[in-house]
Regions:
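N-terminal extension/subdomain marker
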Residues: 1-89, 96-103
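Basic- and aromatic-enriched surface patches that contact anionic nucleotides/nucleic acids
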Residues: 1, 87-212
Length: 212
């Protein structure tokens, strides 16, 4: 479960799981003067190599810590959503910190005349807690108890070598500039989404949304 993955990361941080590198097709790009990689990975793998800097005593040696503790009720809801066929197409954002040198190796294959992005294979050391989860912790840990943690693949944007202050700034930028869907817009969208649903309860939900 989610607690087990966090425990493994805390106790065995930076220790190899095995000597075989994880190899993933990836795209290398630059954004804001920072190098990053885009790839798709099975949640179980990312849960092992990822780690969340929670604001807790266990992480006092790491500074700054910026993530709130995982919420069990929210995780349970996300797990059910995933097991019922739901999915989140937005990327998990991680950082392989400068402390973890040589954890990444990008094997370049190809580029095109239309883009400076590079296509290749990203080789990642298979070790616990080498990538900090900056955004998407609940989406990721929602897979911990899911039947799809080994078969689904989730999108990831991975930075290489952001320092702790840059990580904190990125976390703040993401959370300050994201805007939640307003209650009014949500009702309008639910009406459109469920109006012709074959499920009676969903059609009733659409009707309620149109009346409110």
């Amino acid at each position: 479960n989610a607690a087990l993955y966090q425990f493994l990361g805390l106790v065995f941080k930076n220790e190899k799981i095995n000597d075989e590198r994880i190899e993933i097709p990836a795209i290398e790009g630059d954004m804001g003067g920072k190098k990053y990689y885009m790839f798709s990975i099975e949640p179980d793998l990312l849960l092992k190599i990822g780690f969340v800097l929670h604001r807790a005593k266990a992480n006092e040696s790491e500074f700054p810590t910026y993530q709130r503790l995982l919420q069990p009720a929210r995780l349970k809801g996300i797990t059910k959503f995933i097991n019922d066929g739901g999915y989140f197409p937005n990327s998990i954002i991680v950082n392989f910190s400068g402390k973890n040198k040589n954890k990444l190796h990008f094997e370049f294959f190809k580029t095109t005349k239309n883009s400076s992005s590079k296509l290749g294979v990203l080789k990642i050391t298979n070790a616990y807690a080498i990538a900090y989860i900056i955004d998407g912790q609940h989406r990721l840990y929602g897979y911990a108890n899911s039947q799809y943690k080994d078969s689904n693949t989730i999108p990831v944007v991975a930075f290489d070598g952001l320092d702790s202050i840059e990580q904190l700034q990125l976390f703040m930028d993401i959370n300050e500039n994201q805007k939640a869907v307003s209650a009014t817009l949500r009702l309008d969208l639910e009406e459109d989404l469920y109006w012709d649903s074959p499920v009676a309860a969903s059609r009733l939900k659409a009707l309620r949304s149109s009346i409110i």
